């Protein structure tokens, strides 16, 4: 069973990584402030009250509590999948999805909004601003989809 728990420790590491970066952004940036990094990449401090990429940001505050419980429930399901899977890439994928989800859930519970700060763009066209937790979730899900990790053997 210990080997299963080490993957939860990895999830906590990814959650803390996201949290430390967000702490630094909150400490050194003002909301709306933009810092040019490289062509096509800015650091841009925004707060997202919606879901991924700002979807449903206009939804009533009453429904946000439902979203928090839904996200919490989904994280529990992913933890169950983490304990049932057998392959290392599945453990890794579920661990980073859980870590990213916990990072954003923490923001949503404590701050009421998720801090996003990575701004990718080409010319005047910008991708929606996102954060490290979003990257963790997307990478983990891509690993599961590409490798067929949805199959519980």
Swiss-Prot record:
NCBIfam families listed in its UniProt record: lspA
Protein name as it appears in the record: Lipoprotein signal peptidase
First-tier enzyme category under EC: hydrolase
Keyword tags: Aspartyl protease, Cell inner membrane, Cell membrane, Hydrolase, Membrane, Protease, Transmembrane, Transmembrane helix
Recorded name of the encoding gene: lspA
GO MF annotation terms: aspartic-type endopeptidase activity
Transmembrane annotation, as ranges: 5-25, 36-56, 65-85, 87-107, 126-146
Subcellular location: Cell inner membrane
Name of one Pfam family that matches: Peptidase_A8
Pathways per UniProt: Protein modification; lipoprotein biosynthesis (signal peptide cleavage)
């Amino acid at each position: 069973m210990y080997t299963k728990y080490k993957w939860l420790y990895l999830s906590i590491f990814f959650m803390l990584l996201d949290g430390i970066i967000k702490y630094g952004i909150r400490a050194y940036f003002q909301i709306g402030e933009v810092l040019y990094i490289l062509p096509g990449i800015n650091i841009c401090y925004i707060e997202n009250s919606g879901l991924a990429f700002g979807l449903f940001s206009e939804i009533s505050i009453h429904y946000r509590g439902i979203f928090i419980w839904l996200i919490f429930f989904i994280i529990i399901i992913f933890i169950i999948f983490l304990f049932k899977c057998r392959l290392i890439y599945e453990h890794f994928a579920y661990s980073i999805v859980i870590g990213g989800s916990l990072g954003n859930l923490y923001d949503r519970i404590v701050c009421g909004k998720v801090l996003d700060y990575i701004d990718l763009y080409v010319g005047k066209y910008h991708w929606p601003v996102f954060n490290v937790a979003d990257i963790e979730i997307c990478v983990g899900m891509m690993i599961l989809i590409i490798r067929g990790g949805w199959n519980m053997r």
